């Protein structure tokens, strides 16, 4: 029962780190990156569909992204979705493909994006700590019900603390890396 609780908590913490990694990759840096479009959804025949499922996204240059829709009639919808996103870019449509030029970030915008990255990192760490709290409650219940001895539960709590520290450290590293990317001119 203790092992299941620890395994479940670690699995959830891994997922929280994965979500944080995805969230941070969606924050645009000064360079073109196909991942920055991963959170954009397009209205596709009445259904909301990720842009990555409707087109191929390539980066031919450091500050240019080329988006080629699989269906030419979706050009306008994709262009509108990009324009209405929070990326702050202006796509151009030449009839076959959409070109997105990535402008240089201003110092003020960089600082805002760093704040955004730190906030996303903090949200992920709160999520990890909530997972830890729930696992600790489960361990306390196991101890109270007499399903395991006090020594076993104490050892499991220490293991859980180590695991929590490992995952919060991973999140800190992700945020630090993203901050470095954002502040790099």
UniProtKB/Swiss-Prot annotation:
GO terms for biological process: translational termination. It is found in: Cytoplasm. GO terms for cellular component: cytoplasm. Keywords: Cytoplasm, Protein biosynthesis. Residues 145-164 are annotated as: Disordered. It comes from the Bacteria. One of its GO terms (molecular function) is ribosomal large subunit binding. Its main location: cytoplasm. PANTHER family: MITOCHONDRIAL RIBOSOME RECYCLING FACTOR PSEUDO 1, RIBOSOME RECYCLING FACTOR. Responsible for the release of ribosomes from messenger RNA at the termination of protein biosynthesis. May increase the efficiency of translation by recycling ribosomes from one round of translation to another. Belongs to the RRF family. HAMAP family: RRF (MF_00040). This is Ribosome-recycling factor. It comes from Mycobacterium sp. (strain KMS). The gene is frr.
């Amino acid at each position: 029962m203790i092992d299941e609780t620890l395994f479940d908590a670690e699995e959830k913490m891994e997922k929280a780190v994965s979500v944080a990694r995805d969230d941070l990759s969606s924050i645009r840096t000064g360079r073109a990156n196909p991942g920055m479009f991963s959170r954009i959804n397009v209205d596709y025949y009445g259904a909301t569909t990720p842009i990555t499922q409707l087109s191929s996204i390539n980066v031919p240059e450091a500050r240019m992204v080329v988006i080629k829709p699989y269906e030419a009639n979706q050009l306008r919808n994709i262009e509108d979705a990009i324009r209405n996103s929070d990326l702050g870019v202006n796509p151009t449509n030449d009839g076959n493909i959409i070109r997105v030029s990535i402008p240089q970030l201003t110092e003020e915008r960089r600082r805002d994006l760093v704040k955004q990255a730190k906030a996303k990192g903090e949200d992920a760490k709160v999520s990890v700590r909530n997972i830890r709290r729930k696992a600790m409650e489960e361990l306390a219940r196991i101890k109270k019900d007499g399903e395991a001895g006090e020594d076993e539960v104490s050892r499991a709590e220490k293991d859980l603390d180590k695991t929590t520290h490992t995952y919060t450290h991973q999140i800190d590293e992700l945020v630090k890396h993203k901050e470095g990317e954002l502040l790099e001119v």
